[in-house]
Amino acid sequence: VSASSSAWSFPDRYDAEIKQAAERWLPGYDWRLWKAQLYQESLLNPDAVSPVGARGIAQFMPGTWLEVSRQLGYQNLSPHMAEPAIIAGAYYQGRQVRMWSAPRPDSDRYSLGAASYNAGAGNVLASQRVCGGANGYAEIIACLPRVTGDHATETKTYVQRIWRYWTEMLLGVK
């Protein structure tokens, strides 16, 4: 068996749904960026449950799932149902990205959106205020420990891994 044929790759089971959701709710971004975020969230596992209670492929906390479900008109759907959760997560991430509307690079906008998805938009906005209104992702994330303490490391790693997984997907590394 050659190394290339035995190499692990990112699961492609939900690629069509991820691509469709990203094109609708994250226009202008490569759909694999949303796939990388879902991979970071749950390893693309719709049955995933985090130690703090986040659920499904997009790792929704119960209150956020109820809010987003209501906004999308979902009734009696579970965050463990892959397709609706992929759509709802892309919708929610798109909302986080659009919140960071000041002129800045698209990569910073996505990173700030992902940090908001992970740590809560209020915490990332507070970090921006603590940093004197900083605009760039690197500057804002550097102040996050002053807002969330040790949890800031988790958020910084979360965003770094999304970009790493996306790069690996593009290069076919993993």
Regions found by a protein language model. Give the residues of each.
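Acidic/His-rich structured neighborhood in mature extracellular/periplasmic domains
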Residues: 42, 62, 84
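Generic alpha-helical structural context detector
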Residues: 35-39, 58-62, 115, 160, ...
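Conserved alpha-helical segments that form or flank metal/cofactor-binding pockets of metalloenzymes
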Residues: 41-49
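Peri-catalytic and regulatory segments of divalent metal-dependent proteins
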Residues: 13-25, 48-49
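Short, charged helix-capping/linker segments at alpha-helix termini
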Residues: 22-31, 102
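Extracytoplasmic
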Residues: 13, 29-34, 39, 52-55, ...
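Non-catalytic cell-wall polysaccharide-engagement segments
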Residues: 1-17, 66-91, 95-174
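Short, surface-exposed glycine/acidic/tryptophan-bearing loops
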Residues: 48-69, 132-134
